[in-house]
Regions:
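Short, flexible, surface-exposed loop segments at domain boundaries
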Residues: 1-18, 41-90, 130-147
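N-terminal glycine/threonine-rich, aromatic-flanked beta-hairpin/loop signature
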Residues: 2-7, 13, 82-127
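Secondary-structure transition/turn motif
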Residues: 23-28, 97-102, 118-123, 135-141
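Beta-strand/loop nucleic-acid-binding surfaces
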Residues: 27-44
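Broad hydrophobic/π-residue packing in well-ordered secondary structure
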Residues: 29, 56, 106-109
Length: 147
């Protein structure tokens, strides 16, 4: 199995536009620099208390830098497209709402900054309040959030 370089935790109160304060699942409080010249770094926004998946690296000066930040709290919920209708649930479960679906997604996880749905690997191009854009070799898939 591939090693997952993702750090999981909760977004801290000290988070700002250029700095993620991450209280990791291991109990450490990390301060991570966010370069806002690349708007794709943060997906799903940053709200204190939200669950976060971080892909980071150490800069030469030792500072922790964010390569990708995925707000897992924002990822949860009901998403629909023309042919898909599914709920991303806490704990890695996907609930499929299309009866005729032949190969439904039943599980999800983050691996090295990518979203795995069953065995399908997607880059998260955009995670907004009402839309989710996933990309893989087969193309770009856009989903809308349903309340």
């Amino acid at each position: 199995a591939m090693n997952d370089s993702t750090i999981y935790g909760v977004c801290g109160e000290g988070t700002s536009m250029h700095n993620l304060e991450l209280i990791s699942d291991g109990g450490d409080t990390l301060s991570v620099f966010i370069d806002d010249e690349n708007p794709d770094v943060v997906q799903g926004g940053l709200l204190a208390g939200d669950r976060i998946a971080l892909i980071g690296y150490k800069a030469e000066d030792g500072e922790m830098m964010a390569q990708k930040i995925i707000n897992l709290t924002s990822l949860l919920g009901k998403w629909t497209s023309l042919d898909k209708n599914f709920d991303i649930l806490e704990g890695g479960e996907v609930k499929n709402n299309v009866k005729a679906e032949t190969n439904p997604w039943t599980s999800w996880k983050i691996l090295n900054g990518k979203l795995l749905l069953n065995k399908d690997t997607f880059a998260i191009d955009k995670l907004g309040s009402d839309s989710l854009m996933l990309e893989n070799t087969q193309g770009i898939f856009v989903f809308k959030r349903q309340e």
